[in-house]
């Protein structure tokens, strides 16, 4: 991938977790902790950047994303559906499973919108094109289908003024932007605002947005997190990573000015793992801009 057109930034590893597929970072501001998931190990991570300590909650099934709730527990989107998880005991309860009939699908990336609802998308274990969907779990605990015909549902972000939703279906190499009404529902079919060049031989994965409205996109197989202007489609910056499978990112820290980055080691050959010993770890980059506060589930 050629990112020579932008000033490269650097990241450093803060937790050499060795996760097969670390994903879904979420800054839990009330606890000053980073929530993240180790999808294939079926567990939720809670990382304290101040002490460097990390603990896990076993979920019992592949978990794609996790967010805190207004009541202080956790909401996870998993292969078994939407689960409420008590962070101390690990006790789990099923809320709803909108794809219970799709045995080969699991939930992947997800986030809460500014209205306190969880958006989470699915993917087929064999990456069957169009076999997945994007769902929204409303605060009444009912699921609503937001987009069908998805292949690998991934990054989500909302603009600070609540006018725009950004969404990634990874194999398309595109970020779609949807106009929203005052209730946060899409009012158009979406337009392409960012496109990852096919020549880079990577796909867009997780995504976050900063206080200036710019998108930060993790490049799976691209060894980088890249910053883009959704208005012009222009790439503005790049965080160089020491591992190829960069999965997602979010802003955290007391001032939301640290970019936390997740990575993976799955699908890497032994010689690649030798060259990428920190693959599967959590990283932090100082990128010179702050992010927006993450939202909790209001239900």
Describe the predicted segments one by one.
Residues 28-29, 34-40, 75-80, 118-128, ...:
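Conserved beta-strand positions in repeat-built beta-propeller and related beta-rich domains
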Residues 250-299:
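Blade-level signature of beta-propeller repeat domains, shared across WD40, Kelch, NHL, RCC1
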Residues 174, 178, 195-234:
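Loop/turn-rich, solvent-exposed surfaces of beta-rich toroidal or solenoidal domains
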Residues 178-186, 287-292:
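Short loop/turn segments immediately following beta-strands, especially the blade-tip
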Residues 43-45, 81-83, 132-135, 174-176, ...:
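A short loop-to-beta-strand structural motif that recurs across blades of beta-propeller domains
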Residues 10-16, 52-58, 93-100, 142-148, ...:
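A short beta-strand motif characteristic of beta-propeller blades
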Residues 91-146:
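Hydrophobic alpha-helical segments and helix pairs
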Residues 17-31, 60-75, 101-117, 146-164, ...:
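Beta-rich, blade/repeat-based domains predominating
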């Amino acid at each position: 991938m050629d990112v020579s057109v932008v000033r490269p930034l650097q990241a450093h590893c803060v937790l050499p977790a060795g996760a097969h597929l670390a994903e879904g970072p979420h800054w839990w501001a009330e606890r000053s902790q980073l929530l993240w998931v180790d999808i294939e190990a079926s567990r939720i991570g809670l990382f304290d950047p101040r002490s460097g300590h990390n603990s896990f909650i076993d979920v019992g099934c592949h978990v794609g994303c996790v967010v805190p709730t207004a009541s202080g527990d956790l909401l996870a989107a998993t292969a078994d559906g939407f689960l409420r998880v008590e962070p101390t005991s690990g006790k789990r309860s099923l809320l709803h499973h909108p794809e219970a009939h799709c045995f080969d699908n699991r939930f992947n990336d997800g986030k809460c919108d500014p209205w306190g609802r969880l958006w989470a998308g699915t993917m087929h274990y064999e990456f069957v094109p169009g076999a997945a969907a994007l769902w929204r779990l409303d605060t009444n605990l009912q699921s609503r289908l937001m987009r069908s015909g998805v292949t690998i549902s991934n990054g989500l972000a909302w603009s600070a003024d609540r006018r725009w939703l950004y969404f990634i279906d990874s194999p398309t190499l595109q970020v779609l932007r949807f106009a929203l009404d005052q209730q946060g529902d899409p009012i158009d079919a979406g337009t392409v605002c960012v496109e990852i060049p096919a020549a880079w031989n990577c796909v867009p994965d997780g995504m976050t947005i900063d206080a200036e409205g710019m998108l930060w996109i993790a490049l799976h197989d691209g060894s980088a997190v890249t910053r883009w202007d959704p208005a012009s489609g222009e790439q503005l910056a790049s965080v160089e990573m020491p591992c190829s499978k960069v999965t997602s990112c979010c802003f955290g820290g007391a001032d939301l000015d640290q970019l936390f980055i997740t990575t993976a080691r799955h699908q890497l050959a032994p010689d690649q793992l030798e060259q990428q010993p920190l693959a599967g770890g959590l990283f932090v980059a100082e990128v010179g801009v702050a992010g927006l506060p993450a939202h909790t589930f209001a239900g």
